[in-house]
Amino acid sequence: MDETPELEKATFGAGCFWHVEAEFRRVSGVVATHAGYMGGWKDHPTYEEVCSKETGHAEVVEVVYDPARVSYDELLRIFWTIHDPTQLNRQGPDIGTNYRSVIFFHTPEQEQAARLSMEKEGGSGRYSRPIVTEIASASAFWWAEEYHQQYLEKRGGGSCNW
């Protein structure tokens, strides 16, 4: 009998990936996180290229999770709380499409859940401006350079600009 859990992936962009990754790493049921880039047109982009805003990529975090321990809906709830989804192509002082608010879905079920979640958030009264989060199909995920992986954890805390 195979006891290995069936793991799933979720991918979120919510500004600087250092902060986003640190938040999701705290969640029980999250097995792994990876900082990287998605949503652009250049293969194997570097951090410098993504920051140039000429590759179309967003800084994202790929979240590998056990759905028996944490639901995708719970990950979405966390996503909405860790950034301001009303800021277009920025989070705080970090400006550019690479810092956009985006949910990349991996399955039709994730797409439906993301859209319902965004509709619920939009009607929650929490925001004075409309939500501008993009919801898009997951494309190639490119790992960020090693020094970006678990960046805040490795450096004993700190934060991004947001």
UniProtKB/Swiss-Prot annotation:
* Catalytic reaction(s) noted: L-methionyl-[protein] + [thioredoxin]-disulfide + H2O = L-methionyl-(S)-S-oxide-[protein] + [thioredoxin]-dithiol; [thioredoxin]-disulfide + L-methionine + H2O = L-methionine (S)-S-oxide + [thioredoxin]-dithiol
List GO BP terms, alphabetically. cellular response to oxidative stress; protein modification process
- UniProt cross-references to PANTHER family, sorted A to Z: MITOCHONDRIAL PEPTIDE METHIONINE SULFOXIDE REDUCTASE
Q: EC number(s) for this protein?
A: 1.8.4.11
The record describes the protein's role as: Has an important function as a repair enzyme for proteins that have been inactivated by oxidation. Catalyzes the reversible oxidation-reduction of methionine sulfoxide in proteins to methionine.
What pairs make up the disulfide bonds?
A: none
The record's listing under HAMAP family reads: MsrA
Q: What Gene3D superfamilies would the database entry show?
A: Peptide methionine sulphoxide reductase MsrA
Q: Where is the active site?
A: C16
Supply the InterPro entries for this chain.
Answer: Met_Sox_Rdtase_MsrA_dom, Met_Sox_Rdtase_MsrA_sf, MsrA_MetSO_reductase
Task: Give Gene Ontology CC terms.
Answer: cytoplasm
Protein name, per record:
Peptide methionine sulfoxide reductase MsrA
A Pfam family that the UniProt record links to this protein = PMSR
Q: Which family does it belong to?
A: Belongs to the MsrA Met sulfoxide reductase family.
User: Record keywords: Oxidoreductase included?
Assistant: yes
A molecular function (GO) held by this record is:
L-methionine-(S)-S-oxide reductase activity
Entry keywords, A to Z: Oxidoreductase
